[in-house]
UniProtKB/Swiss-Prot annotation:
Domain of life: Eukaryota
GO BP term, example: proteolysis
UniProt enzyme class: hydrolase
PANTHER family from the UniProt entry: CHYMOTRYPSIN-LIKE ELASTASE FAMILY MEMBER (PTHR24257), NEUTROPHIL ELASTASE (PTHR24257:SF16)
Keyword line: Hydrolase, Protease, Serine protease
EC assignment: 3.4.21.-
Keyword Zinc: no
Protein's name according to its UniProt entry: Neutrophil elastase 2B
Gene3D superfamilies: Trypsin-like serine proteases
UniProt KW Aminoacyl-tRNA synthetase keyword: no
């Protein structure tokens, strides 16, 4: 976004950041699960609350200089 400004956390709950290797590469908008938008019903503030553990593992981008060993070979 050009000329944008930082948003408060949770201010835009329908926006998503797709990330790869620890950095943002694409934005997304969540559009499913909001029910029937053509009615006069209020939109839910939370679609679904889920508590999960997310693990991000490091990636090796190079060789440490030592010999490569796999199963003792």
């Amino acid at each position: 976004i050009v000329g944008g400004r930082p948003a408060r956390p949770h201010a835009w709950p329908f926006m998503a950041s797709l990330q790869r290797r620890g950095g943002h590469f694409c934005g997304a908008t969540l559009i499913m699960g909001w029910g029937q938008l053509g009615t006069n019903r209020p939109l839910p503030s939370v679609l679904q609350e889920l508590n999960v553990t997310v693990v991000t593992a490091g990636i090796c981008f190079g060789d440490s200089g030592g010999p490569l060993v796999c199963n003792g070979l």
